[in-house]
């Protein structure tokens, strides 16, 4: 099953896939050029000092033996200029794990809009950083304007158990939605 890992630039998508994958990940991080640095606002909190960016995809795999399921994790670029590639990567996905950062919540709306336009179900995982403001899940749900059915969790993309919990929230949601749509 194909799962998107999406979110804005510098949110932890590559880290999350590397953390979860049981195989060496495919990643297409490249050094940011002056042109890319001027196109992306690297002065925002959480982006200062960023020197690389994903220019195509990240890919990893996670087998869930108990469910006899293999999850193929596809990380999408976080910049609008990669939208055509993003759309190609999204083809065939059954859902998305959207990563968000409380320092830049407004940047998550564009990604959630793209996912909703494609008709994909998703969960939101707020990736925690040392300098991130701390909000309750209810406050985050309100700030992100999420439906009550949309799973919302916090995670640390560097921590396997934490990131796995976020992926479990998404897959449980997808299974429940599939059951709702059964005749």
Where are these regions (language model features)?
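Canonical P-loop GTPase G-domain recognition
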Residues: 129-183
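Conserved G1/Walker A P-loop phosphate-binding module
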Residues: 1-47, 62-65, 70-72
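Switch II (G3) loop of P-loop NTPases
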Residues: 66-84
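Conserved C-terminal guanine-recognition region of P-loop GTPase G domains, centered on the G4
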Residues: 99-149
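Conserved catalytic network of the ASCE P-loop NTPase/AAA+ motor domain
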Residues: 54, 63-66, 87-92, 114-119, ...
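A structural signal for isolated positions on well-ordered beta-strands in alpha/beta enzyme cores
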Residues: 4, 123-124, 153
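A short hydrophobic beta-strand->loop->alpha-helix junction that borders the nucleotide-binding pocket
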Residues: 6, 64, 76-77, 103, ...
């Amino acid at each position: 099953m194909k799962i998107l890992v999406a979110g804005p630039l510098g949110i932890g998508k590559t880290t999350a896939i590397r953390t979860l994958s049981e195989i060496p990940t495919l990643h297409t991080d490249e050094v940011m050029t002056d042109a890319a640095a001027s196109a992306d606002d690297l002065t925002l909190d959480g982006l200062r000092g960023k020197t690389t960016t994903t220019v195509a995809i990240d890919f990893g795999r996670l087998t869930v033996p108990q469910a006899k399921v293999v999850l193929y994790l596809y990380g999408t670029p976080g910049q609008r200029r990669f939208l055509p590639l993003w759309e190609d990567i999204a083809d065939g996905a059954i859902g998305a794990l959207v990563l968000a950062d409380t320092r830049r919540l407004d940047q998550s709306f564009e990604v959630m809009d793209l996912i909703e336009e494609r008709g994909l179900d998703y969960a939101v995982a707020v990736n925690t950083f040392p300098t991130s403001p701390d909000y309750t899940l209810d406050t985050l749900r309100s700030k992100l304007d999420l439906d009550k059915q949309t799973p919302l969790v916090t995670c640390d993309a560097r921590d396997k158990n934490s990131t796995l919990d976020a992926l479990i929230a998404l897959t449980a949601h997808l299974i429940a939605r599939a059951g709702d749509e059964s005749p």
